[in-house]
Amino acid sequence: MVVFYPNPYLCAKFESMNNSFTIGGQIVDLVNSRIFSGVVVVNDGKIAKIEEQPVGNTRYIMPGFVDAHVHIESSMLIPSEFARLAVCHGTVATVSDPHEIANVLGKDGIRYMIENGKKVPFKFYFGAPSCVPSTAFESAGSSLDANDIEELMASPDIYYLSEVMNYPGVIHKDPNLMRKIAAAKKHDKPIDGHAPTLTGKALQKYVSAGITTDHECFQLEEALEKISLGMKILIREGSAARNFDALIPLMATHPDKLMFCSDDKHPDELDDGHIDVLVRKAISLGYNVMDVLKAASLNAVRHYNLNVGMLQEGDDADFIVVDDFKSPVARQTYIKGVLVAENGVANIKYEETQTPNIFKANFIHADDLFVPDKGKKIKVIECVDGQLITNCFTTDPKVVNGGIVSDVENDILKIVVINRYHPAKPAVAFIKGFGLRRGALASSVAHDSHNIVAVGVTDSDILHAVNLLIEHTGGVTAYCSTEMVAVPLPVAGLMSNEDGYEVAAAYENATALAKRLGSKLYAPFMTLAFMALLVIPELKLSDRGLFDVSKFAVCSIYEE
C-alpha cells in the first residue's frame, strides 16, 4: 500500500510567507476573454476581490503558464529543482507523468516524486503511469499492474491516467490495460493518449476507449483526424521532439482543442525557457493572443480539473506580471500569493534529497561489443533530428578482422543497450544520424525502461563511456581519448540531487563535447535516450535486441 500525504504547500507550510497584498495593472481575464484596468486584492493566498478601476500601472497581470504534459525526470532534476527553474519563466503548474521513475522504482518512485514536489511552492499534478513497462520486449526495474493503477487512481494526489502507449492493447482490448482505463473512469479522471501515426478504424477504437488527448502528433492531417474524433491535441516543443511548426496552424482553426507541452525538457533548455517560449513564438506568428494564452493555461486547467488560479475571485492567487502581454516575459511569478520568482531569479530554496536507485550493471569488456560478419547486409536505424520516430534501411557493413565496425565516413555507428537491472551482455546494432567523428556518448536515461544506451565510433570509445557511467551508477557521459564529461544522476539513474543551475551547466558541457566530437543533432543526448523507445516507429534497440515497431517484435540486425 502506497500512502500519500497532504501537500503542505496547499496547507500551512508557507503561511509565514507574505501572501496577502494588493496589486494593480492591466488584468488579462482569459475566462471572459477581455483585458481591463484594475486591482487584484490577495488575502491569504486567495484572490479576495478584483476591482475594475483606472490604474496608472501599464504592466499586465495574467494567469501563469501550465505545461500540459511533462516528464520531470527528463530535466534530470528532482521536482523541487525543476520548480526553481520553471517559475522564472512564468510556469506555475505542470501535468506531470512520473513514467520514467516508475519504470525504475515502481510505486516508490511515484511517491518520491510527489513528496519531493510538496517541498516547494509549485503545483505539480501527477498521473498514474499506464504502461510500466511500456512493452514486454525490454527489461525494466519495476512494473505496475491493474491492481497498482486502481490503488493509485484512488489517491487524491493522482490526477489522471498517464499516456496509454500500448495502443495495440487498447484496440484488441487487453484485459489488464482495460482495467487500468476503467479505474480512471471510475474516479472520473482524464485518460491521456500516446498514438503516433494511428489513423482510421484503429484510431476510432482507441478514442472510443475514453482516451482524450495526444501529444505525439507530428503531422497536421493526423492531428485534424484526432480532433474530429473529439481528442485534444498537445502541441509539443521539447528537447528532442519539436512539433510546434507542424501543428501551430491548428491555433487558427481549433484553438479550444489545444494545449502546450514540453514532454521532455533537458536542464540547459529549461534554464533558457519553458512554455513562455511557445507563447511568444505563437503570438509572433500572428495568432490570436487570447487563444494562445488559453492554450498555455486555461485549456489545461479545465481539461485536467486543476486547482490553478485563473484570475477569478475565489481562485488561488497564481499569476504572473509581464510588461507586454503580446511578448510575455515573466517579471514576477506568484503561486498561492507567494512571490516565487522575480526578474529571472527564483525565491525557492534548494532542498536536500535522498538518492533512491537500482543499478546492477557490470562493467563491459571489448569482446562484449563484437558483432560477427555473416556476409549479409545489416539493418540500420536512422534517427531524425527533432523527432522521436526513426527510419530504417539496409546496407553493406564495414568489416574489420571478421567483425562489423562503425563506418564513420557514412555516419553508421555502433549503438548498444545494456540491462542495468541485472548483469547481461549488451545488445548491439547500428545507427545513422549522430555524426560523431570520434568518441562516444552514453546515458542511463533511455526511454522507457532506462537501461544504458550508448553510441560511438570505436568499441574502445563505447566501453570507456559506458564504464564511466556505470562508475557513477547512472548519468550521461561524453568521452574521447583526450577529454571526458560525466553528469552523475544518482536519483534512479535519471535525476541529479544537485542544484538545478549547476546541473544545467554540467549538462551543457556534456552537450558541447558531444558536438565537438562531431554530432550535428540539436540535442544529441535526448535523441540517444529515445533510440530505445519501442513504442514509437520504426526501428529501435532494446536490451534484448533490435526491435521492429511495425511488427512489434525483436528482429535480427542482419537482412532476412
Placement of each model-derived feature along the sequence:
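Active-site microenvironment of metallo-dependent hydrolases
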Residues: V3-G38, V42-N43, E51, V87-H89, ...
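Residue-level marker for buried hydrophobic side chains located in beta-strands
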Residues: G64-V66, F126, F260, V455
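Active-site mouth loops of central-metabolism enzymes
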Residues: V66-I78, P133-A146, T212
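Divalent-metal coordination cores built from histidine and acidic residues
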Residues: A83-P190, A486-P488
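Short, ordered loop/turn segments at secondary-structure junctions
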Residues: P98-I101, P129-S130, N166, P196-T197, ...
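Short acidic, glycine/serine/threonine-rich loops at helix termini
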Residues: L105-G109, T135-G141, H172-N176, A202-Y206, ...
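Histidine/acidic residue-rich metal-binding segments in metalloenzymes
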Residues: S143-S162, G169-L234, S239-F260, L270-D291, ...
